[in-house]
């Protein structure tokens, strides 16, 4: 069984939220131990024609891009330990996509509030976020994702170190979560001949409520 995943993600993406909740359910409610390495990918960069020649991660004003501030905060949170990062990562996604309230990822007060709620040292986080190396890391991860795996959207999951799969889902019911995980891993890793499986929209996702 695959027990390590690399996932390219953008906090602005609701399907990243759904995958994160699904994986958390697998761990906390299904007893499946899977390590997840979350890596930043900038949807604003992928969807931009970049007419100015400036990459999203090089923009000076962190309040302009949708999620650059949150991505930098995520990398800074990793410096306080994997457990605290995972808590922060999940809480940011829940705040943005699961709270039913408007939550701007480019608002410093929002980021710092979630950081405190996640048990992070706020002063250290703010200091680490000033490290320009984090912007460079975001740029490198995004560029490598495109170059090495052809990543175009989020979440894209690397399940065996080489085969990438873009996964767009609603949150699976708990009783189906483990079976779906095994099925996805099997298709992503053992069926390299599969290029795309996509439901017509509509009728999907009519009838689903999450």
List PLM regions with ranges.
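Local sequence-structure signature of Cys/Sec-based thiol-disulfide redox active-site neighborhoods
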Residues: 1-25
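C-terminal cap of thioredoxin/glutaredoxin-like
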Residues: 5, 23-28, 99-210
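Conserved short-loop catalytic and cofactor-binding motifs
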Residues: 11, 61, 126-129
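Short beta->alpha junction loops/turns
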Residues: 12, 78-81, 131-134
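Structural alpha/beta surface segment adjacent to cysteine/selenocysteine redox centers
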Residues: 17-110, 183-187, 191, 195-208
């Amino acid at each position: 069984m695959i027990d390590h995943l690399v996932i390219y993600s953008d906090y602005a993406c609701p399907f990243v939220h759904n995958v994160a909740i699904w994986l958390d359910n697998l761990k906390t409610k299904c007893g499946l131990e899977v390590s997840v390495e979350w890596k930043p990918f900038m949807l604003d960069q992928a969807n931009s024609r970049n007419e100015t020649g400036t990459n999203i991660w090089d923009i000076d004003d962190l309040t302009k891009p949708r999620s650059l501030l949150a991505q930098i905060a995520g990398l800074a949170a990793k410096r306080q330990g994997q457990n605290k990062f995972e808590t922060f990562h999940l809480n940011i996604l829940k705040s943005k996509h699961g709270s039913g309230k408007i939550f701007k990822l480019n608002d410093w007060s929002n980021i710092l509030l979630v950081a405190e709620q996640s048990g992070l040292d706020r002063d250290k986080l703010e200091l680490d976020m000033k490290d320009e190396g984090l912007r460079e890391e975001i740029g490198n991860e995004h560029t490598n994702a495109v170059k090495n795996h052809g990543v175009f959207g989020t979440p894209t999951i690397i399940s065996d170190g080489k085969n990438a799969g873009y996964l767009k889902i609603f949150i699976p019911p708990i009783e189906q979560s483990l079976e779906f995980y095994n099925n996805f891993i099997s298709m992503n890793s053992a069926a390299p001949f599969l290029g795309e499986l996509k439901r017509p929209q509509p009728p999907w996702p009519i009838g689903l409520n999450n």
